[in-house]
From Swiss-Prot:
Family per record: Belongs to the acetaldehyde dehydrogenase family.
UniProt cross-references to HAMAP family, sorted A to Z: Ac_ald_DH_ac
UniProt-listed Enzyme Commission number(s): 1.2.1.10
Organism annotation: Marinomonas sp. (strain MWYL1)
Descriptive protein name: Acetaldehyde dehydrogenase
Length: 303
């Protein structure tokens, strides 16, 4: 029989709520707790209505129940400012932390590029970069796996309505973390990230533009093949991930244009930026659970 790993979601906002709905369908992860700090939080109320245990008194209140409820995975959907303390407390109790903030104190995780490596090493904190990073870094990695990328620039355009207060408070961290991961995981020598929050009504679907500048003339056939294969890999956990145009070659520049449609679990389908983040985080937790079930890794003993 499959053994689900039991999980807590910290942060009952847009991301936390969408993650909870996705987790309810998972074969590998069982959501048990949601932690917030606002007694009037809509997210906590929704979680309670779904049969999830909740507290509005923060992580310290939840920790008292962690061992008894056998919580093994935590998803932090709060803010970069508080993540480090959350992670320190939970890692000390043998909980694997999946960080959906731009704090990036653990290694970056882009599932089709490097998730297996993290799961096999039992990394206790993995960072999901940003929505822009999840949508674009697979494409940079697809190009850099064929030829050296001197410079990569990504532009993530998201609807204003899909961007909650947590993301707005972390815009600088968003651009820095994404650019850093474009280099470290995407394989570009230099990376740059731009986020555009579009207030248009009706809201636009998430759009992502990826420009890669190569150090030599492009191998068009193999780059195209690599990009198409990577799109299929991402579609395994984000079905609405689509190549709109490209790769387009202009001298040594390669341009790729993507859109991301969400599943519409919590926010409407235009919020692909929310979906790709939560789907990638859940895929990451599921890979850890699969490795535990197959005895490839052993979770920390805490009894």
């Amino acid at each position: 029989m499959r053994k689900k790993l039991r999980a807590v979601i910290i942060g009952p906002g847009n991301i936390g709520t969408d993650l909870l709905i996705k987790m309810k369908r998972s074969d590998w992860i069982e959501p048990v707790w949601m932690v917030g700090i606002d007694p009037d939080s809509d997210g906590l109320k929704r979680a309670r209505d779904m049969g999830i245990k909740t507290t509005h008194q923060g992580i310290d209140d939840f920790i008292d129940y962690l061992i008894a409820d056998d919580i093994r995975i935590a998803f932090d959907a709060t803010s970069a400012y508080v993540h480090e303390e959350n992670s320190r407390k939970l890692n000390a109790l043998g909980v694997v932390m999946i960080d959906l903030t731009p704090a990036a104190i653990g290694p970056y995780c882009i599932p089709p590029v490097n998730l297996e490596e993290h799961a096999n090493n039992l990394e206790m904190n993995v960072n999901m970069v940003t929505c822009g990073g999840q949508a674009t870094i697979p494409m940079v990695a697809a190009v850099s796996s064929v030829q050296k990328v001197d410079y990569a620039e990504i532009i993530a355009t998201v609807s204003s309505r899909s961007v909650g207060p947590g993301t707005r408070a972390n815009i600088d961290e968003f651009t820095r973390t994404t650019a850093s991961a474009v280099e470290q995981i995407g394989g570009a020598r230099k990376g740059k990230a731009i986020i555009v929050i579009n207030p248009a009504e009706p809201p636009l679907m998430m759009r992502d533009t990826i420009h890669c500048l190569l150090s030599e003339d492009p191998d068009e056939v193999n780059i195209s093949k690599s990009v198409y294969n990577m799109v299929k890999e991402v579609q395994k956990y984000v079905p609405g991930y689509r190549l709109v145009n490209g790769p387009i070659f202009d001298g040594r520049k390669v341009s790729i244009f993507m859109e991301v449609e969400g599943l519409g679990d919590f926010l409407p389908t235009y919020s692909g930026n929310l979906d790709i983040m939560t789907a990638a985080a859940l895929r990451t937790a599921e890979m850890f659970a699969e490795r535990v079930a197959s005895k490839a890794i052993t979770l920390p003993n805490r009894h």
